[in-house]
Design a protein with these regions (language model features):
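N-terminal secretory targeting modules
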Residues: 1-37, 43-50, 64-70, 177
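Alpha-helical cap/lid subdomain in secreted, periplasmic
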Residues: 25, 31, 54-177
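Structural cue for short, hydrophobic secondary-structure segments
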Residues: 37-38, 106
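A secondary-structure boundary/capping signal
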Residues: 38-39, 169
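A short, flexible beta-alpha/helix-coil linker loop
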Residues: 41-44, 109-111
Length: 177
């Protein structure tokens, strides 16, 4: 059984791609780079059959295969059942201490679609995006596949405000499930 996933539909905000372009230039140069992933159980890979099947590792593996001259460090700071409120309290130690060049943030399933979680998510995004090492940031919006519920609406507003690239599983993968 094959899936017909239209990846273009997943781009909900292209944002300012300056840092992404810089990331790709650095990756082509063959230096050392750190890729970090911050989120809940989806990022952690808790339901993956093996850790190499979780999205975070697959993204890391794509970079390794695409840029073989570059030595990549993989930082998976996914902790199941946690929200952006907990994420903002641990981001410095679990992510920023590694001086990441690229950070994916994913809390759309565990956060509620409320103003409170929009504030905690914004605090997290500001901490990462405003870091002195200026990492490229990608916001990933997942969804409860059984109900279609997520905090994507509130999180997308933050991504648009800071002009950050954002992708959504709702119009792509969720549409196929």
């Amino acid at each position: 059984m094959g899936y017909d996933v239209h990846t273009e539909k997943g781009f909900v905000n292209r944002g300012n791609l300056h840092r992404m372009k810089k990331l790709m230039r650095l990756a082509r140069q063959g230096d050392r780079m750190t890729l970090a992933f911050l989120g809940g159980s989806i990022t952690q890979g808790s339901v993956s059959s093996q850790y190499t099947n979780c999205y975070a590792y697959l993204v890391y593996d794509w970079f390794v295969r695409r840029f073989p001259k570059t030595a990549f460090t993989y930082v998976n700071a996914g902790v199941g059942g946690t929200t952006s409120q907990f994420g903002v309290s641990r981001v410095e130690e679990d992510v920023l201490a590694f001086k990441p060049d690229f950070v994916i943030i994913e809390f759309s399933v565990n956060d509620d679609n409320t103003d409170f979680y929009q504030e905690t998510y914004e605090g997290l995004v500001r901490k990462v995006y405003g870091n002195q090492f200026a990492p490229a940031v990608l916001l990933v919006h997942n969804i409860f596949y059984d109900s279609g519920v997520s905090a994507e609406e509130k999180h997308r507003e933050i991504g648009a405000h800071y002009q950050l690239p954002s992708v959504s599983m709702k119009p792509t993968v969720y549409a196929q499930v």
